[in-house]
Amino acid sequence: PALIDLIRAGRRVERHHPWPRVSVDGGTWRSAAGALADGSLSLLGLWGEPSRVHMALLDNSTSNIGVISLDCPDRRYPSVAARHRPALRPERTIHDLFGLVATATPDSRPWLDHGRWQMQAPLGQRLDAAPDPAPYPFLPAEGDSLHQIAVGPVHAGIIEPGHFRFTASGETDR
């Protein structure tokens, strides 16, 4: 569907500027994810509140912009990333900050909270921290021509020190 079709399917939210915003149902939310997947819309933003999620969308054929919002009374919403992978990190962020769960997401690992926070969902229901946080499985870079380069500890000036691992493909760095 075009962005105008999604806007017409929703309930207009008054006093939202400069772009129109509507509250939609789960079916319309899923239709927007499908339009992202087929390239007719572009994702400008995906963010949450304690009980709802929002998507800012660009219609690629008209350059119109609009925002759709979905209430999450059961703290769940249909995953956008299941159809459009660039939505994956914002979905994981929404879960970490607000405790809202994207159903059928392809990756449910935490994005911000790796088990070190004193609580879960600090901007949502503020639940106690998990007693035994699960280990965070970082995804490895794998392949015959890949080389891992460890750098650090380093200090980059205005940011804190860190230890980084870069992956190079196809050539040896000496």
Q: Where are the language model's segments positioned?
A:
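Terminal low-complexity/charged segments
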Residues: 1-173
